[in-house]
């Protein structure tokens, strides 16, 4: 596989997206049915960096190629990656799993929902980034999630992040341990000015929670 990019704005962000051999074979068969010389696939993310992020793939005929797309050449077809989507496709894998019903194309993109933050990002944006990138993937193992409600400048305790736990974390008997040893520690490691982390969630409402 070779790569090519004419967009200097993202020249340092080379995508490492992988299309496995089995997926390449499957896509090659689909593309061959289009009877269009030089046709490839275009890969992009809708609503990147949000909980609604969705990874997409579409046919891309030669005349439809977007000049700023990053081109990956596979043996039987080209793949064009939407330049703004590149950071959200980090470590993404497109695979094809055969089964008795035929098979299924799968798209795993662990960073598609992770928001990006720049050097001038607000503390709210930085906290949300850490929650999405570092904390929620671990909580997801219990069917839980965590989101930022607000940041308060508490006169007594200093800068305080108020969090809301949901899903499997709601009603969890070990929430204090989870908050203190996990979430709070991780947030303070990444955001040095943060002094305290508190939980806004009412854990008495245990219905539908993972832990009871």
Swiss-Prot record:
Which residues take part in binding [4Fe-4S] cluster?
169, 172
Keyword line:
4Fe-4S, Iron, Iron-sulfur, Metal-binding
Please list the GO terms describing molecular function. 4 iron, 4 sulfur cluster binding; iron ion binding
Cofactor(s) the protein requires to work? [4Fe-4S] cluster
Keyword Iron-sulfur present in the record's keywords: the answer is yes
Q: Which domain of life is it from?
A: Bacteria
> Per the UniProt entry, what is one GO biological process?
protein maturation
Listed Gene3D superfamilies: Fe-S cluster assembly (FSCA) (3.30.300.130), HesB-like domain (2.60.300.12)
Bound cofactor: record note: Binds 1 [4Fe-4S] cluster per subunit. The cluster is presumably bound at the interface of two monomers.
Give a short account of what the protein does: Involved in iron-sulfur cluster biogenesis. Binds a 4Fe-4S cluster, can transfer this cluster to apoproteins, and thereby intervenes in the maturation of Fe/S proteins. Could also act as a scaffold/chaperone for damaged Fe/S proteins.
Q: Which family does it belong to?
A: Belongs to the NfuA family.
Subunit info here reads:
Homodimer.
- Please give the PANTHER family that the UniProt record associates with this protein: FE_S BIOGENESIS PROTEIN NFUA, IRON-SULFUR CLUSTER SCAFFOLD PROTEIN NFU-RELATED
* Name listed for the protein in its UniProt record: Fe/S biogenesis protein NfuA
Question: Which species is this record about?
Answer: Acinetobacter baumannii (strain SDF)
């Amino acid at each position: 596989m070779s790569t090519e990019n004419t967009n200097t704005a993202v020249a340092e962000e080379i995508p490492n997206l992988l299309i496995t051999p089995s997926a390449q074979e499957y896509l090659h068969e689909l593309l061959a049915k289009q009877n269009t010389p030089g046709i490839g696939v275009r890969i992009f993310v809708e609503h990147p960096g949000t909980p609604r992020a969705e990874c997409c793939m579409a046919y891309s005929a030669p005349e439809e190629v977007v000049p700023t797309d990053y081109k990956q050449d596979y043996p039987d077809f080209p793949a064009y990656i939407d330049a703004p989507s590149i950071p959200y496709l980090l470590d993404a894998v497109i695979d094809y799993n055969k089964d008795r019903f035929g098979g299924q194309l799968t798209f795993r993109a662990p960073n598609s929902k992770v928001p990006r933050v720049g050097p001038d990002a607000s503390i709210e944006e930085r906290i949300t980034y850490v929650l999405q990138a570092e904390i929620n993937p671990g909580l997801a193992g219990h069917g839980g999630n965590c989101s930022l409600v607000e940041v308060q400048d508490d006169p007594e305790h200093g800068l305080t992040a108020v969090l809301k736990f949901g899903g499997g974390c709601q009603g969890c008997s070990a929430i204090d341990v989870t908050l203190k040893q996990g979430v709070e520690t991780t947030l303070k490691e990444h955001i040095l000015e943060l002094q305290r982390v508190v939980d806004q969630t009412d854990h008495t409402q245990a219905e539908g929670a993972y832990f009871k």
